[in-house]
């Protein structure tokens, strides 16, 4: 009897089932094409779709328009990245170099920065990748220049892209060091004195692969590298070695790497 009671008491602790719910356009989602999903500290789910930004409170959707001088921006070149920074501020960024910030007091997205006309006039998509670092900088990247918009000072720093390749992903290691993935490989770089400096790293420099996704695990100082049709690589900063796990998913394209339960 004691054994049975013991098992029954433990049962609630052992069961941790997840609840999943399908939501789609019939529930109010503005479009079936969803490019990014974020969850803020209030529990709202934010979806960047082909129509704009949707917020879901668990019951219903609310759609937000992205406006520039009275014109709604709903083309694919303006709907590319949806980020939450370390201060829980929501940002939407497009390949045309326009940056929107969500204003919770006015409950709307406000255009806070856009690239100068002389930068965008000859390039329909002047930005190949955007990234928010822990120094409050929004990176707007192409193969020639990096435009760093500081969200606190509203100042923009233009620096030369020393890699001279289209950037596909960035992972920040510490205050000044970054891993930068491109369509040709991966690079170790330092952002210092208003310039990007490439640092030698033979185990990465000699890895000619197209990078889709980077994830840096700080406790182990390991970089997980998701590639296009080459599976996963792992670079250990402690041993300076690059390896492929036994289950490397060779010939598979890796588009996202996320830690479990995070």
Predicted regions and their residues:
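Carboxylate-rich, polar loop motifs that coordinate divalent cations or form catalytic acidic clusters
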Residues: 1-262
